[in-house]
């Protein structure tokens, strides 16, 4: 069962994300909302999350990962939908993400390819955008975008996770 990541989870979370070749920048920042699941032995087995942009209207989906032995179970779709739902609950109207390898997966969820310039313009203060700009990686990324449903109670359910 997914639970919100706590400060005590951050080391394990970062190690898991590194093993999935995902960005670990700014995991503890207030705008970054992360959830994880642990197996019976206490090891992280799935993660998901998003970073809410400073305007509150754009969210950068990030840290969607499934341990290799659990792939093919539908967990990836479940995790992605969870992040999208939580971002919409927080008031986001647009979802964005970087993915060089999983475009087909994200297209199943309604994402379409966009430019990294468009993503960076929508989320200029996102930690991942700033990191990719500073390292020159932004131009090598592939960006994706989709609108989110407008929720009448946006922001009310984020803390409930």
Regions inferred by a protein language model and the residue ranges of each:
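Short amphipathic alpha-helix that is part of the acyltransferase structural core
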Residues: 1-26, 34, 38, 43, ...
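Small/polar loops that bind or transfer phosphate-bearing groups
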Residues: 5, 62, 97-98
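Conserved acetyl-CoA-binding loop-helix of GNAT-fold acetyltransferases
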Residues: 66, 72-85, 89, 97
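Accessory recognition modules or surfaces
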Residues: 73-79, 124-138, 143-145
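Conserved active-site alpha-helix within GNAT-family acetyltransferase domains
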Residues: 89, 93, 100-127, 133
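Conserved beta-strand in the GNAT
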Residues: 36, 42-53, 57-65
